[in-house]
Regions:
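A short beta-loop-alpha structural element at the N-terminal edge
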Residues: 4-18
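Amide-forming acyltransferase catalytic core, primarily the GNAT-like/NAT-type
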Residues: 18, 22, 26-51, 55, ...
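Glycine-rich acetyl-CoA-binding "A-motif" of GNAT/NAT acetyltransferases
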Residues: 59-62
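Acyl-donor binding region in acyl/amide transferases
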Residues: 74-137, 206-263
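C-terminal functional modules
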Residues: 258-287
């Protein structure tokens, strides 16, 4: 590495400098409060850092950000490093791979990359990442006037929802509370419960329910008409948007919005439901 350029970890005290660097050079659309909300989540006890950065004469010239989480799996506790924004100014692009090497040099983590741009797909493969290809689909929210019935109970307040969730799902719910743009709802039948974590966004001018997580994909499929009708009448959204990998079956009348979305991981994913979009930048930044 050039003596002029230094590589070091991004600590909490650096987050604002990194934010302004990315806001100026990469994505001006992210708000500072959302940025802080993402990196100040208590998803891991004593996270090591927030990623790595390149500096020259105290100025940030490149970053590779990361969100860390500690997940309960069938095999026990799994430490996950979810890499997010990887951006280096053109003049310093020769140092980009040093950021990736530093990130992967951390021991004891499963590494995921869920918003990789196509121009760095091959670089991820060269660093030993495995790939998973999915599709983004849209489900029309069709009206069903009797969606609220004895068959399907709808719970939205935290006190009511939490008592019907098992310990694992309840922790996921807790970890994603108090995020300004994110909503949660629980659908319940006599013998099943479904937690949905989602946000509302405008896609191509159309108001849409965007689902990050389903705790019970089979239940979602079986009750899709009632659930999507609820989104239509209560959230005033015309479509529900979800990745194919998050559902068990493709609903009738759904259509593809985007194909060949490639997600990456490196490490042992056995026991972890990969891919999932919780505990990641999708919750905060990806639009």
């Amino acid at each position: 590495m050039s003596s002029m350029v230094t590589l070091r970890e991004i600590f909490d005290k650096d987050l604002e400098d990194v934010y302004y660097f990315l806001s100026k050079n990469f994505d001006p659309g992210v708000k500072l409060d959302i940025w802080h909300s993402a990196f100040n989540r208590s998803w891991m006890h004593e996270k090591p850092n927030n990623g790595f950065m390149l500096k020259e004469n105290e100025a940030v010239v490149g970053v590779f950000c990361a969100l860390y989480s500690q997940r309960q799996t069938r095999k026990g506790i799994q430490n996950v490093c979810n890499t997010s924004t990887w951006f280096v100014l053109d003049t310093y692009r020769s140092h980009s791979l040093e950021l990736m090497a530093a990130m992967l040099g951390q021991k004891g983590f499963l590494f995921t990359s869920l918003s990789t741009s196509p121009n760095v797909y091959e670089l991820h493969r060269q660093f030993g990442f495995q790939s998973y290809v999915t599709t983004l689909i849209a489900i029309p929210n069709l009206p069903k006037l009797n969606y609220f019935s004895k068959k399907l109970e709808i719970l939205i307040d935290p006190e009511s929802t939490s008592k019907w969730l098992d310990a694992h799902i309840k922790q996921i719910s807790i970890d994603h509370m108090d995020i300004p743009t994110v909503q949660q709802i629980v659908f319940r039948t006599s013998n099943e419960t479904l937690l949905v974590i989602f946000d509302i966004r405008t896609v191509r001018g159309v108001r849409t329910t965007n689902i990050f997580y389903l705790s019970n994909p089979d239940m979602f499929y079986e009750n899709q008409y009632e659930i999507c009708s609820y989104f239509l009448f209560h959230n005033h959204t015309l479509f529900t948007r979800i990745h194919r990998c998050s559902i068990s079956k493709v609903p009738t009348f759904s259509f593809e919005m985007k194909r060949n979305i490639t997600l990456f991981y490196q490490g042992d994913i056995e026991g972890l439901s990969f891919p999932e979009f919780i505990y990641s930048e999708h919750i905060f930044f990806c639009r």
